[in-house]
Amino acid sequence: MRDQPLGEFLEQLAARVSAPGGGATAALHAAQSAALLGMVARYSDGPKHAEHAVTIASVLAEVDVLRVEAVRLAEDDAVAFTAVTDAYRLPKGPERSAAIAAALAGAAVPPARTIAVAERLVALAEVLLPVANRNVITDVAAAADAARDRKSTRLNSSHSLPSRMPSSA
């Protein structure tokens, strides 16, 4: 996904395939949030905001790391859900049941981590808001909104848990 053109990603997202899906999209929302916060921090770094330089530098360093992590989580989510689909295609029996359980447990990890990243991004938006360059302040709000989309990630995460395991896998 990292190097995939946006139009191609959206075509794949719209296709009748298991991945990418909601979890990958939520992680990309977090990546967009981090990118916007990074932009705001960079526009806020300078002589006019010198008294907040340490705070701005700290936020900038963290959001850059979180942006990279969120993109990785989007990729991890797509891989994990492909594993779920592959497990469901196995012939019925104990090996299939075990494969489904393992795949579902693995598929819950990226959304859970995405939630943590998004929550941290909301906190960083709150830190940046009072010290940010006023010309880009609305971008802080857009970043916070993108990160708050983690609620859909909670649904993806809970839907990935072994409760989806069929009784006669």
What are these regions (language model features)?
Residues M1-A19:
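Short, hydrophobic/aliphatic alpha-helical segments
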Residues D77-A146, R150-K151:
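Amphipathic alpha-helical interface segments
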Residues A15-L36, V136-S152:
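Conserved phosphate/anionic-ligand binding catalytic regions in large, soluble enzymes, centered on
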Residues L37-G38, R42:
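Ribosome-associated translation termination/rescue signal centered on the conserved GGQ peptidyl-tRNA hydrolysis loop
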Residues T153-S158, A169:
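Conserved small/polar residues in nucleotide/adenosyl-binding loops
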Residues P47-L90:
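A structural-propensity feature for long, helix-poor, extended segments
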Residues L13-A24, A57-V65, S97-A108, R134:
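Short, charged, low-complexity loops and linkers
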